[in-house]
Amino acid sequence: MEISALLTSAGINISICIVLLSLYSILRKQPANYCVYFGRRLVCGGARRYDPFWYERFVPSPSWLVKAWETSEDELLAAAGLDAVVFLRMVIFSIRIFFIVAVICIAFVLPVNYYGQPMVHKEIHLESSEVFTIENLKEGSKWLWVHCLALYIITSAACLLLYFEYSTIAKMRLGHITGCASKPSQFTVLIRAIPWSPEQSYSDTLSKFFTNYYSSSYVSHQMVYHNGIIQRLLRDAERMCQTLKHVSPEINCKPSLRPCTFCGGPTATSSFHILSNEADSVKGMELGELTMTTTTTEQERSAAFVFFKTRYDALVVSEVLQSSNPMLWVTDLAPEPHDVYWKNLNIPYRQLWIRKIATLVGAVAFMFVFLIPVTFIQGLTQLVQLSHAFPFLRGILSKNFINQVITGYLPSVILILFFYAVPPLMMYFSALEGCISRSIRKKSACIKVLYFTIWNVFFVNILSGSVIRQLNVFSSVRDIPAQLARAVPTQAGFFMTYCFTSGWASLACEIMQPMALIWNLVAKVVTKNEDESYETLRFPYHTEIPRLLLFGLLGFTNSVIAPLILPFLLIYFFLAYLIYKNQILNVYITKYESGGQYWPIFHNTTIFSLILTQIIALGFFGLKLSTVASGFTIPLILLTLLFSEYCRQRFAPIFNKNPAQVLIDMDRADEISGKMEELHKKLHNVYSQIPLHSQKSSSKAECSNPFKKQELPDPEKLKPEEGDAIAKELWGFQGNESGQEHDTKS
């Protein structure tokens, strides 16, 4: 691929980014778009501000960048939770390591590659991208020691940064456990596969079992019922309530001037009446009473939440095998109430292993089916073969600009469009597996999307050709390093264009929120719906973490092979830090989280990227007949594997299990302070399948908001006119208390 094609792709994507970021800085200042760009603040109780019409509202400004840059990590932790902090630390790690990599490789490796062979160089924009790769070095070149030394520096810096980040995040996770002393999940165990007995109900069987074997620690239990229809009806009713409760009777319930021809009712009065929001028509009823009126023993499922006196008791029960039959009395630590995926608790436990195998087969089959569009896309980068296959295209492809667009821009755009179908499908597969919580489902989807992305974007593209070739390329294990070494330099141009489109342009689309903006416009203009209640989104970790890791993989593998990509990746990571931080603070709401469990995924994938880079470099040193560089690369691979194993032994268990020492100290502190009895009283009503306001389960109550004691400032710090009571009434907004899950992006 020529540099001119890369410049064309870069110019198109830079223009898209500038236009979208400028539009965002204008649209976010419009009062009608507050529910799109400030959904999190509004839901968490921020007051809507009235902005008079003036010129500054229609002028782009970088104030949101300044705000995102100035927000500290402590403020972010209080506002969005540990997962958001861990994600941004992933971005910060990427900025740090690739700054080091870019300085080393651009300063030393790139000049060695460019002047690797005696040749007459053209102007830069007419050069081929392969001139800047290690492919340009001649066999037996003595300059390959520069690449080997750079590889050692990159690996050492990456491992050092990974160690400090792993240590810091492990401490943050322990602080997250101790800082949430009132979490009911720490006292609760989820029991599945309760044995069925024709003589008694599941509830009686469970009560008898735990009274017999855990009489000193067992408190009570809450059965899981098959009341999905009731849940849906109540959820719909609650959403309708949230829609109506923001309606002001004085404004929206004016007498109708049009006679009613259907019901014969009065035409000059309004029959619409808003009830008070006290207990929401269930005042005076206990949660258990309402549950028993809608559920019976026939609707009980073989799953329940069991509550214990101390956190340590719950931990022991969750880790111990309860029966000689491992398929009965299966125990897990319960997820948080708003993290429970109730639908999957109805699945019989004996079906789970079949579901996991089926979803694995489905995911692998989809990965291979995806070879078809990827192979077609790679054909677009090979114009010579394309013109031979389709002779009628030779005239069009002979035009320089069209040639540059097809080779430098179109393939990556088509690949991204195909990839939009991947995250929803992987989320569906993860739900079919039977995950007990939404956070586990999202983590599982994240891993699936990560594998899918690395396989199709990296391996399938660098080993481009027919589908048959994809299956035969790894026929010999010894050929893998050499095959990868030959293929990576040829795809360096494609990876750079993919960085432009999937990186820069995708970030600009992320901050614009085009789907939410269009939906808001349709609701206000087409349907004339002025309701400002907004169903907020959850941060899509299952799509953004794989994208981040993919670019890290591309950066490491191309660092000593084709370092021209590094400055563009560094720009992407810096933009990602500002844009994601802005979105987390203003748009996305945290209703549940994993407690930092995404970091081991990031750590392990980064180690994989380093080892893959070393294997590719080893293959290239072999192709270039440099035995010294090859000999020094093998110990580096072994040292990286040893470092990975040390981190797995030292830090990984903290992310898989809760330490008993910490939980016992928390139990003792609660017993001394007298809080334990109060916690026991709250346990039973927390894990209810029926959503009630009396449960205090609203997103407004659960999201911590560092701005809650302040009025929500205008994005440009514009002050409203004093004493404009009518405007405040018109633009007043109270947060949506339901905070229901937006499944399309959760």
From Swiss-Prot:
Keyword match Zinc: no
Pfam family name, one: PHM7_cyt
Family: Belongs to the CSC1 (TC 1.A.17) family.
Biased composition regions of type Basic and acidic residues, renumbered to the chain: 708-723
Protein name (record): Hyperosmolality-gated Ca2+ permeable channel 2.1
Topology of this chain in the membrane: Multi-pass membrane protein
Origin superkingdom: Eukaryota
Residue ranges, compositional bias (Polar residues): 692-702
Sorted UniProt keywords: Calcium, Ion channel, Ion transport, Membrane, Transmembrane, Transmembrane helix, Transport
Annotated gene: OSCA2.1
Main location: membrane
Segments passing through the bilayer: 3-23, 90-110, 144-164, 357-377, 405-425, 445-465, 492-512, 560-580, 601-621, 623-643
Compartment(s) where it occurs, according to its Swiss-Prot or TrEMBL record: Membrane
UniProt source species: Arabidopsis thaliana (Mouse-ear cress)
